[in-house]
Amino acid sequence: MTSINLNLTMAFSLALTGVLVYRSHLMSTLLCLEGMMLSLFILMALLISHSHMFSVSMAPLILLVFSACEAGVGLALLVKISTNYGNDYVQNLNLLQC
């Protein structure tokens, strides 16, 4: 395993650990999820370019699009929770009335 792959794997595992540790605050969880998605994007792009599998070269771009959609929905939920309750605790998610 090269050092770049090792660093990206460690970045993904640190972001996953951050999600598990800071799961009570929505903002911290969203930042850690973005870190996970960014490390997955870079790892996929490097592996595809290294192995010359250009038939799946759209996969990192699709992952990036889904990551942007996830960030948009997460930030909208964060704004809704923070304006209604004044904090970003995840425990407030079950209190939202749709």
From Swiss-Prot:
Q: How does the protein associate with the membrane?
A: Multi-pass membrane protein
Q: What family does this chain come from, according to its entry?
A: Belongs to the complex I subunit 4L family.
- GO biological process terms on file: ATP synthesis coupled electron transport
Is the Electron transport keyword given for this protein? yes
Protein name, entry field: NADH-ubiquinone oxidoreductase chain 4L
According to its UniProt record, the EC number is 7.1.1.2
What organism is this sequence from?
Dactylopsila trivirgata
The record's GO CC annotations read: mitochondrial inner membrane; respiratory chain complex I
Which sequence ranges are marked TM in the entry?
1-21, 28-48, 59-79
